[in-house]
UniProtKB/Swiss-Prot annotation:
GO cellular component: cytoplasm
Record's keyword annotation contains Protein biosynthesis: yes
Gene name of this polypeptide: GCN2
GO BP: any one term: translation
Composition bias type Low complexity, residue spans: 267-276, 307-321
Subunit structure: Homodimer; homodimerization is important for kinase activation by uncharged tRNAs.
Residue ranges of domain Protein kinase in the record: 425-731
GO molecular function: ATP binding; protein serine kinase activity; protein serine/threonine kinase activity; tRNA binding
EC number: 2.7.11.1
Residues annotated as the enzyme's active site: D586 (proton acceptor)
Protein name, entry field: eIF-2-alpha kinase GCN2
Biased composition (Basic residues): 1-15
Organism: Arabidopsis thaliana (Mouse-ear cress)
């Protein structure tokens, strides 16, 4: 007997349903068309498993055979199936169809009833929204059947697992415990910071010009809700058709999981990067992609050829300019650019004004986009293009001087700007190539001291790489430690690359400088880069004459005290580096130096990975073949013995323990001198591959052998940190014992006199003044002004803030300002790295890390049950090295009270409205999850409680990638490897995690029914799925449907997001049309748990829940589209009140400007008693004021103004206006931007 839903339908009845039928009765033809299209799509998808019985007198009936995800996806067939019969009633899809389940084999009566109940709930939910549903019902049923496959079949099919299988590896008792929620394991959170990667990008800028190129303006200032995405109310039919095409045209791909080579699903090719890099790649920056495993290389030949082709097409060689640009650009345009260049030579009156002039001409429509681009190219490029177009004229002209290029472009040596490098330094000898540049020993002509100067060529086309280098250099400049190489200063110079020059690589600014690539990985120089102007970054560093490798080469006599002395200094330097969030990654004796006093200095951070910057630059790895020093290459061959296993195995998550492995090898070389190179090779090979140590050495130094084994443990978590070594591994020193005693007294004694004396010494004014002088002499040179942003950047920031405020106010939120700092003891602490400050009174202050906790305390104190608030304020993050805290502008929007899911939808609507006004449509992805759902997934996959935090940390690395994207599937390959190798998770558990990633994460409409079918319907899980379903329903009402994903593997960013939570990412497509890593813009969710925690602790009362979102405005500022321009409405045009004659007429000017201020007209005057008219015109030009109100001597009678002249400089219009009519005239003229002819008549 089949299980039918008809009886239950009769019991439910429902006047509400009749109301819906009445509303949609007039759309019967449209509903029939939807059903017809759905049946067509279902027949194409399920083919012989789908039967349609149609009768003209009754609604159609559809019978679909249900199977688990098995044969269609590449598994062995199973002995379980059922028949789903769907009878659509008039009014479908707004009326729920009648459903019947007929078990065929392997399905018990109880399971059939459960399945029918599940499908009824799913159908009712879809019918309320009027959405076609049969395909979703089938998917939910398939997931349900996959979960009840008999265990015998699971055991047989384990060897042939694929990425799409929901296999039953976990014992049934474990699956029944999903409802334990947080009590079943730790609540994991906080692996991504809203402002990750922004610390150094704001605090440091070495770019010569921070001004942005702004192309076009936004047309209107008021918020336009029509710009929000509008989608059709239903996307299922299109998805059916796409799915049908896939099923008919292509069989489903099979992707086995038991080998690395086949881990990538859906035939996504895995990119491989060859270890050989071109010279330009080495000079471009620190970070390059690591080479992948050799067994993945065959898949990428086509990709590599495509990339190389695109690069060649995008290059600006002289030949391509001459051949390609001339047919597209007229000779008239070329001649105009030539004349502009002649007028703007360095010796002329318009020196260096070419960019401004060309921009103005482009805005006026005189210069096209192509001509503007050509005008901005380097002189050699344009000259060749010009000569190619006018070669006949230049040969036959009687005035050859006219056709010649400007003297400063064809004779660069005639007038060279000053080169700081050539003026201040004298080259002594080359030291070799470093991690991201060439290094030369130089003598400073001013102080006579020797320095190592590194020169890096910044390629204009690779702005992200250049920005990354700048951030790294700024970071390294803050590593002020006695055992770390000092970085003194850095600066930019412009030069010309000549790849055929000799070894001398000195720069001649704006001239024909020579730069040699000798000694780099590749000597092949692309022809199109010849003789192009480039920007070079110079870094002045501390010079260290010897390396530890050189010491090892003459290390014949072993001294135990000397070994402990060196290793302590090395570990102290490492501890400082790791404390700043930096991994060296190339820690070898070649990069450990000795200064003039024979103290250890750690240097050459060419392969360093900055943990605090990696959120901006996740690129899968770094090249290990970049040369490191002049003594020995730091490529893969040179660093083999020192490379940690996790780096060799391409683990995606690398921490500072990789350096500790390298330290182990250095430690062993210090304690075991080698007689020959062969002896070193044999012993270190056995140590690395087998973990074997010379037995004689182990017996002589058992403690050192034990420490070495810990340092070189294959598992990073088993290795000690540098701080732990300093505390426990070294022989005690007398000064350390004295310091420990002082610290113990400070922490335990009731007498605060010791603490007060220490604080007094810290804040001693003489000591602080001395430190200030020292740091000012040694710190990397930066802008000597204290203005944080340029004028245009400030204007853009203000514009974004105003948009954000306006959206908040539209939703009736009230502004509540948060106190930016508080005493550390004033509120409970969460486990986060907040910025803490010490006052001269010994009190500890904490700067705001986030803006929500103070608001929750305010809710609790004021017992608010319904409230909307917003706040835009700075939060603070720890900086790297000796730098002030990093301020990050954040906007919060919160709703207290209201219906669950509905208020969540509103805060998402707020974010969509803001981003739609700033970025292009569809540029943001919304990732949804639920705390109870995440716990259910942990149990479903079999992740033990002790592993959840590390698993979540690894999975969060792909959270910024769109679910089901090829980039995310590629990232999973490496995450899977680390889960198996580091955590030693059973392969069956990792396979289930991959099933979650491949089937339960993705488009919300597809993932939700699959989750309902797969997960047990316990109360917490069912509640979580219902809340997600309701949220999606509300979002559709506001037309927020596209780019909404469910990501059940996404952990929350805060501990209090234990219900619905979300993350919003800004996505940008690359040149190949695929999306890169998303940029985190906003995080949010419900925080009922936090509200109740605070209320229970402080007031013992219950308050309604709350939901909020935090928007990273600082991130938005860094990713503003180039076509965004603040609204400069001419209504707000400033007026300059001027005078002509009459001794300056200062009183009259002051009176008139005050009157304009009272009428809310922006006005100013030149603040001098008697300015000349020329001075006033110059003032207007400098301050971009177009409208002048001129008071003349003849227009003043008895010290009273009778009339004035109103002049518009841009329109070249003028009118005499009486004093009484002036305000009205200005307001009317500004309303039409002064351009209506009737204004001036």
């Amino acid at each position: 007997m089949g299980r039918s839903s008809s009886k239950k339908k009769k019991k439910r009845g429902g006047s509400g349903r009749r109301g819906q039928l009445k509303d949609h009765g007039s759309n019967a033809d449209e509903d029939n068309e939807l059903l017809s299209e759905e049946i067509t799509a279902l027949s194409a998808i399920f083919q012989e498993d789908c039967k349609v019985v149609s009768d003209s007198r009754s609604p159609p009936q559809i019978a679909i055979k249900l199977r688990p995800y098995s044969k269609d996806m590449g598994y062995e067939d199973t002995d379980i199936s059922a028949m789903l019969i769907v009878r659509c009633l008039p009014g479908y899809p707004y009326k729920c169809p009648k459903l019947q389940i007929t078990p065929e084999q392997g399905l018990t009566t109880a399971d059939a009833e459960k399945l029918l109940s599940l499908l009824e709930d799913q159908a009712n939910s879809n019918a309320r929204e009027g959405r076609v549903m049969i395909f979703n019902l089938v998917e939910a049923a398939q997931e349900f059947l996959s979960e009840i496959i008999p265990e015998s079949h699971d055991e047989e099919s384990v060897p042939c697992l694929t990425a799409h299988r929901s296999t039953q590896f976990i014992e049934q008792p474990m699956l029944s415990n999903i409802a334990k929620s947080c009590s079943g394991g730790p609540f994991v959170y906080g692996f991504i910071d809203l402002f990750s990667g922004l610390e150094d990008a704001r605090n440091w800028s070495l770019t010569p010009d921070e001004n942005r190129g702004i192309v076009s303006s936004v047309q209107s200032h008021p918020l336009d809700t029509s710009r929000i995405l509008h989608q059709k109310p239903d996307k299922n039919l299109k998805r059916f058709e796409d799915h049908a095409k896939e099923e008919v045209a292509l069989p489903a791909p099979i992707a086995k999981l038991n080998t690395v080579q086949e881990e990538n699903v859906d035939d996504t090719s895995i990119s491989s990067f060859d270890s050989s890099k071109s010279t330009d790649d080495v000079e471009s920056g620190l970070f390059q992609n690591e080479k992948k495993e050799s067994n993945l290389q065959d898949d990428t030949a086509e990709d590599d050829s495509t990339n190389s082709e695109s690069e060649s097409l995008g290059s600006w060689s002289s030949d391509s300019l001459a051949q390609d640009q001339v047919p597209q650009i007229s000779k008239k345009d070329l001649l105009m650019v030539h004349l502009l260049r002649v007028a703007c030579t360095s010796r002329g009156p318009l020196a260096d004004a070419l960019p401004q002039i060309t921009d103005e001409l482009h805005e006026l429509g005189i210069l096209s986009e192509e001509v503007l681009d050509l005008a901005s190219k380097s002189s050699p490029d344009f000259n060749r293009t010009f000569e190619h177009a006018f070669n006949q004229n230049m040969a036959s002209t009687s005035v050859p001087q006219f056709w010649e290029p400007p003297s400063d472009s064809c004779e660069p040596n005639a007038s060279l700007p000053s080169s700081r490098y050539l003026n201040d330094f004298e080259e002594l000898k080359p030291l070799g190539q470093g991690g991201f540049g060439h290094v030369v020993l130089c003598k400073n002509k001013l102080d006579g001291r020797q320095y190592a100067v590194k020169k890096i060529r910044l390629k204009d086309k690779e702005i992200p790489v250049n920005s990354r280098i700048v951030r790294e250099v700024a970071t390294l400049s803050r590593l002020q430690h006695q055992h770390v190489v000092r970085y003194y200063q850095a600066w930019f110079e412009t030069g010309v690359v000549d790849p055929f020059a000799g070894a001398n690589w000195g720069s001649k600014t704006a001239g024909s400088s020579m730069f040699s690539y000798s000694g780099a990985v590749s000597t092949e120089i692309p022809e199109q880069d010849n003789n192009l102007e480039s920007t070079y970054l110079y870094i002045q560093m501390e010079y260290c004459p010897r390396t530890l490798r050189q010491v090892f080469e003459s290390y014949n006599h072993f001294d135990k005290d000397f070994a402990w002395h060196l290793i302590r200094q090395i570990v102290e330097g490492l501890a400082h580096i790791h404390g700043q969030g930096i991994i060296h990654r190339d820690f070898t004796p070649n990069n450990i130096f000795f200064d003039a006093r024979n103290d250890i200095k750690i240097g050459d951070f060419g392969l360093a990975k900055f943990l605090k910057l990696e959120q901006l630059d996740q690129d899968g790895g770094f090249s290990t073949d970049v040369a490191g020093s002049g003594v020995d290459s730091t490529g893969q061959a040179g660093t083999y013995f020192y490379t940690a296993p996790e780096i060799e195995q391409d683990w995606p998550k690398i921490d500072e323990k990789a350096d500790m492995y390298s330290l182990g090898v250095v430690f062993f070389e210090l304690w075991h001198p080698f007689g020959t190179a062969m002896e070193r090779h044999v012993i270190l090979t056995n140590l690395k591959l087998k973990g074997e140590l010379p037995l004689k050495w182990v017996n002589e130094f058992p403690e050192q052998a034990s420490l070495l084994r810990r340092l070189m443990s294959p598992s990073p978590s088993d290795r000690p940190s540098a701080t732990e070594l300093l505390k426990h591994a070294f022989p005690p020193r007398m000064e350390s014992e004295l310091l420990d005693n002082i610290l113990r007294i400070m922490q335990t004694s009731e007498d605060s006199s010791v603490y007060d004396r220490v604080v007094s010494v810290i804040f001693d004014e003489e000591v602080l003044e001395m430190k200030s002088h020292q740091s000012s002499r040694s710190r990397l040179c930066a802008d000597d002004s204290y203005i944080q942003y340029t004028e245009i950047n400030t204007e853009l920031r203000d514009y974004v803030v105003e948009i954000t405020k306006e959206v908040f106010r539209q939703h009736c939120a009230k502004h509540l300002e948060v106190i930016p700092m508080r005493l550390l003891s004033d509120c409970p602490q969460f486990s986060r790295k907040t910025v803490k400050l010490l006052t001269n009174g010994g009190d500890m202050l904490e700067l705001c890390y986030e803006l929500r906790l103070p608001f929750v305390h305010w809710i609790s104190v004021n017992q608010k049950s319904s409230f909307k608030r917003y706040e835009i304020s700075h939060v603070y993050r720890r900086a790297i090295g000796h730098s002030p805290p990093n301020p990050c502008l954040q906007a919060d929007f919160d709703i207290v009270g209201g219906t669950l899911s509905l208020t969540e939808a509103e805060v998402l609507k707020v974010i969509v409205d803001i981003t739609t006004h700033i970025f292009h449509r569809g540029s943001c992805d919304i990732h949804l999850n639920h705390g109870d759902l995440l716990d259910a997934i942990w149990s479903w996959a079999g992740i033990k409680a002790e592993h959840r935090r590390k698993v979540a940390e690894l999975l969060s690395m792909m959270g910024s990638l769109r679910p089901q994207s090829s980039e995310r599937k590629l990232k999973w390959v490496f995450i899977r490897r680390q889960l198996l190798q580091e955590l030693k998770l059973p392969e069956a558990v990792v396979n289930r995690l991959q099933t979650v990633a491949s089937r339960f994460c993705g488009d919300a409409d597809q993932a939700l029914p699959r989750l309902r079918g797969a997960l047990r319907a316990d109360r917490p899980t069912r509640k979580a799925l219902d809340e997600l379903s309701n949220l999606l329903t509300y979002l559709r009402v506001w037309r927020i449907e596209e780019h909404v994903h469910i990501d059940v593997l996404m952990p929350p960013t805060e501990s209090y997001h234990r219900n619905l939570f979300f993350q919003v990412f800004l996505t940008k497509e690359n040149s190949s049309g695929t999306s890169n890593d998303g940029v985190l813009l906003a995080v949010g969710g419900r925080y009922d748990w936090l509200v109740q925690e605070v209320c229970d602790r402080e007031h013992k009362m219950n308050l309604p829940g709350a939901v909020g979102v935090s928007l990273a405005l600082e991130t938005i500022f860094q990713h503003l589209p180039m076509d965004l321009r603040p609204i400069r409405n001419e209504v707000s045009t400033s007026v300059l009140v001027c005078s002509r004659g009459g001794g300056g007429l200062l009183v009259q000017r002051m009176e008139l400007v005050a009157e304009l201020w009272e009428k809310s007209i922006k006005a100013e005057f030149v603040p001098t008693p008697d300015p000349s008219l020329t001075e006033q015109y110059e003032y207007a030009n400098e301050h971009e004021i177009k409208c002048l109100v001129i008071i003349t001597e003849s227009g003043v009678a008895q010290n009273q103004i009778e009339f004035v002249k109103v002049r518009h400089l841009e329109l070249k219009k003028e009118k005499v206006v009486g004093r009484e009519e002036l305000v009205k005239f200005l307001l009317d003229a500004m309303a039409v931007q002064f351009r209506n002819p009737s204004v001036w008549s």
